[in-house]
Structures are given as structure tokens and as C-alpha cells.
Amino acid sequence: MRKIILASGSPRRKELLELAGVPFEIIVSEVEETIGAYSSPSDIVMSLALQKASAVAENNSDYIVLGADTIVTYESRILGKPSNEAEAKEMLQLLSGKTHEVYTGVAIIAKDKTVTFYERTEVTFWELTEEEIDAYVASKEPLDKAGSYGIQGKGSIFVQHIQGDYYSVVGLPISRLVRELKQFNIDVTHA
């Protein structure tokens, strides 16, 4: 089986690959995450995932390199990782009682092939009180997460409904990824 590199330092992506039985190494991509002029959220996440994977693939051409990126959108506004606690509170207030979209893009690069794809998931929050938001932000959990919440952590109590791939919201649509890896002759279902 060809070696896989995850071009991400995300503990959540690492956990999901381990859960699925995908053998991999980690080399964190040093790409600056800047969002340029793109036509859609799906273009943004696939482009950023490709940039991350490409940066690592340059020096690791014998490997299959995975890059991923996740953003949250609400009414065409992109909610990335908050820069501080005040911004985290603002994002959570914005999402309170509403449905938003989570996009995760994935890029898989090998010497002979590149595949990109994305998953879109709708997440609906309960109405959140100021106290709930303050306590959650004080926990520091939302500070390194797109949209200022972690669906797999304490942020799960805010979620009323989800339509789509839960794992995509966590940071990696693992079921789709395993299927896409078959194009690279990697089949973890028989490992």
C-alpha cells in the first residue's frame, strides 16, 4: 500500500483517519490560509485543501498527500476560525437558532493523479442564551474551529439538527474519502 501523508495538524482529522483504519503520517502544511476571490464556498475549501496538499506534495512526490479545509457559512458570510473570544461570541450569536452550512473540501494528490471534492452539511442550532455562549467561549474550545464550535465536543449541545455528513462537520468526510482513495489503489476495508 502506498504511504499517505495528512497535510494537517488537526487532531480531529488525525482521529478520523485513525478511526477508519487509514495508515498515514503527518506533515503539517505551512500554507497561509487566505481566501481570495472565489465564486463559491465549495471552490474556497477545495482550493485551500489543494494548496495545503500541494505544498506538502512538492517534497514528498512518492506519497499520496491529503489536504483538507473546512469553513462555515451563514447567509453568504464565511465564518472561519475566530481571531479572539469576542469574535467567537459574535459568530455563536449569529448562528443561534438558525441553520448554517459547513463545507469541507479535500484534495488527494499523487504523482499521477489529483482528486478534489467537497461535502456540504446543514447544521441547525437551538436558540442559545448569552450565558451558554459565554460559558462555551470561556472553555476555549471554539477558538480553533471554523464557525466557533466543535460538533464533536461541548458544542454538540447547541446542535438541534444536522442534514448531511456529520464527519464533514468535524473536519473530514471520512466515508467519502475512503471511497475516493480506492482510485489510488488504497482500500482500507480489507486492511
Swiss-Prot record:
UniProt-listed InterPro entries: ITPase-like_fam, Maf-like
Role summary: Nucleoside triphosphate pyrophosphatase that hydrolyzes dTTP and UTP. May have a dual role in cell division arrest and in preventing the incorporation of modified nucleotides into cellular nucleic acids.
UniProt cross-references to CDD domains, sorted A to Z: Maf
Protein name: dTTP/UTP pyrophosphatase
First-listed, main subcellular location of the protein, grouped into a coarse class: cytoplasm
Residues marked Important for substrate specificity (site): 12, 70, 152
Subcellular location: Cytoplasm
GO-annotated cellular components: cytoplasm
Enzyme Commission number: 3.6.1.9
Record keywords, A-Z: Cytoplasm, Hydrolase, Nucleotide metabolism
Reaction it catalyzes: dTTP + H2O = dTMP + diphosphate + H(+); UTP + H2O = UMP + diphosphate + H(+)
GO biological process terms, semicolon-separated: nucleotide metabolic process
Signal sequence bounds: none
Alphabetized Gene3D superfamilies for the sequence: 3.90.950.10
Protein origin, superkingdom: Bacteria
Cofactor(s) needed: a divalent metal cation
Single GO term (MF): dTTP diphosphatase activity
Record: active site: 69 (proton acceptor)
Family affiliation: Belongs to the Maf family. YhdE subfamily.
